[in-house]
Amino acid sequence: MPTYHEVMTTDLATLTTAAERWDGMAKEFQKQETAYRRDVHGIAMGQTWQGLSADAASSRFDVTLKEFQYAQTEAKAVASLLRDAHAQFVGLRGKLKGARDEAVHAGMRVSDQGVVSYDTEKLSQGERMALAHDPDYRTSVRKSVGSWQERIDQLVKDVEDADKGVEIAFAAVVVDSDIADGTINGFNGRAQGDIEKYEAEEAKDIALRVDSGKASAADYRELRRLFHDNAGDTAFSRTLLDDLGARGTLNLSNTLESLAHYDDTKQSGRYLDIQQGLATTLATATHDPHSDFYERFRTEMRKAGTEQFTLDGLSPIPDERVRGYQSLVTLMQQGHGYSGQFLEDTADDVRHAEESYAAAGHTESVWALRDDFTGKDRGWFANDPLDGVLGIMSGDPATSTEYLDPARNDNLDYLLHGRNWDTVVDHYATPPGGTTTGPPVTVEDGDVRKGFGAALEAATTGDVPGSYHPVGEHTVPQARILQHTINTLYSANQAQELPTNLATPLAHVLTSYTPDTHGVYAESSSRYDIDWDSSGSVWSDKDGAHLAVGHQRLAAVMRGIADDPQAFGHLYGAEQQYAHQVLADIPQGAGDKTIQDRVVDSSRAMGAYDGIRSDVIFDERFQKTQWAADFNHGIGASLSTALMFNPVSDLSPVGDLATRTVDVWAYESNKEHVAEANLAATQQNAETYDAGQHDVEHLVRAWANSRGHDIDSDYTQYFVHAGQDQYDFGRNHTLNTLRSDR
């Protein structure tokens, strides 16, 4: 392997010099071809020499003429490979020099052999003393030296990997690629001038050995190197996948997964690393959706995607086989960087496959298997490929928005209520009195809709999913997707009992839309003051896009979220924070009407949220005390989310006072939530579930205190009482829409 010193000192210009000479050799062969065609080959083609001997000579002369042509092809390819090698080595050496310079700038010394050490000559006296007597300082120096050494060693290793690729290319370029051309070990008429294409051919050969179970440890090491060294290289990626084809790609992926998870788990890291390399190759090869390769590979995958494959060890059930798209998405989950178009096309093709299967008369999903695939040990397999590709898509919020926008397509409708999500064959129905096995009875998998929920979250917030999002400017398509989701769930009677695994992502989403949900419940402007059963609208202004939907539609979805107490607690806490901000934004010196209007808005909105909470307490399905504890935990998490809105301390010119007030309020509020949860679920008690009103009172007192008024003053009490009727209005109307028995 090349050393650091060799990498830094080798005269790379010799490669371009050699390339020029190989170009010159190609020109000489061209001259010889011209002379041979004129002086030898032309004789056999004329009229003066005829008969068997002429025919025999002509065929031999044709072979020789082609050899002159092939020699030119090979010489030009060698020249191109030399220039390719030169470009690679120059680039890699440049990275190594850059790392060395950065290390020196960071206080390191790098020897001619690439050994990193701490440069003590530049230290001040104080730094020298610390190095001599401070163990922590010495440890930090040691770690820094080690980090720089690892970086430089890896860059030298990258040169070694590139050197191996060059070696592979030069060994292959001189091999006669046509054994039927009349020569043995002749010139290579199909020689290529791209190192990566020869590396792809090497990777294909190893992949075939992997599939057949004949790969050696050296093969696996080389395949890892090939994927690492060519990560992001289009020529390598397309050549390899073209050679393997869609089926070959899936076979390789399945074999690697079997080895990693079942057959050779001690070496699982090796196989998963190769699998990641294959996924990167797929992402690179499909990055340009307008390329000939893209159309060719997609066409192949449409066919292979519904075919059945063996994945050894996946299922304890004999003869269980998986579909191609399940294997494809399992592979894709190992990588990243896929183009948005490839993700959308894959999702479209998977949907087409399942719709075609249903149209053919099948009652079960095309992806149905006799086992579930959830949890750490099983969840890696994408048994639901559409949900899987949506999960990948969620990492690209712009693509998620485009894919789910109801103004562009019907994908959102399909996913919300048009799709069969049952992918697990629970059992087979047997006709009464019969002895034959009937049709399969399928159920949802444990991680059903997790990918869809993540994509929905990304599509409506413009942010990667998985956490609560700050309030931000939304686009019209983002708001339109959320509006359509709320209306569709409500119309399909799925709002109050949300489809499995949608509650948490919807809570994440609605937190980001708290100003709009506050406006809907408060009816704070004509845009929000709409019929309670209205499908609403979406509009935009200087602050971005907004949405409004009917009060009872929004409340129904929030009631569905409230089955997850922590998720609903976070929504509740977000409303508390926003209500704080509404009051904090009241101008100094504002009149009583302005103040009262803000208090009324906050009271009405908080009343609506509390109506949802009261409905949960009224519902006998829940262990109320635990629900209340989890709900309080969600509120606490929400209030500790930094900069979701302006900090609560902004309410006061002396932030500590306001913070202490909020702390006391939160403590008392939590006790009231738990106390209410322990009351019997009767209509009389339901009318007294008013801890939320106390939350509003604490809110108003904190605001008044921030403006210099005692929390029990007449001024403060006036505004505390101003919103009580409106709190009751929001709470009771919400509870009435949720409970027909009131």
Where are these regions (language model features)?
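Non-catalytic all-alpha helical scaffold/repeat segments
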Residues: I179-L738
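N-terminal secretion-targeting helices of virulence/extracellular proteins
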Residues: M1-G182, L735, R739-R742
